[in-house]
Amino acid sequence: MFELPKLDYSNSALSPIMSEQTLDLHHGKHHQTYITNLNNFIKGSDYEKLSLEDIIKKSSNEKKAGIFNNASQHWNHNLFWKCMKPNGGGNVPTKLENKIKEDFGGFEKFREEFINAGVTQFGSGWCWLSLKEDKLVVTKSPNAENPIIHNMKPILGCDVWEHSYYLDYRNKRPAYLENFFDKLINWEYVDSLL
């Protein structure tokens, strides 16, 4: 059965970019609910023996919305928490920086594209930096959808569901995304996934 991962930082460590109250609710309540629901859905089924990624792929193909949504949200959040750190942002490791320049034509162009993907995601969803074959691509996805089901490898994800930012930013999703990008991203972790 799946369990809520322990964060690599305290619930107050990302403040004021992401408040302790937001992190308490987002990690301790929302993420925990996805895990509880997933465990209830798969208990006693063939899914119980599968890895999280295999559950996502199989349930997506079999149109098992309850299983897929909760499994995918669990995976998405696991990546999201790892992609942040206190005093994040800043310098990007050379390997990742060179790959970004190669695939996007420059870091600022990538930043703009990533933030724009999150801003323009209608309703709830995610924006992603993923490897598609050997190329980095920015995508967005609705609700719980994950690039894994499109044969991509996500290496950076930002949650743009309202529960991620509404307590701190109200309806200012662009400000949330800019702060996430400039002040929270753990570039060393993202680089390690290349």
Question: Residue ranges of each PLM-predicted region?
Answer:
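Feature for soluble, non-membrane regions of globular proteins
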Residues: 1-194
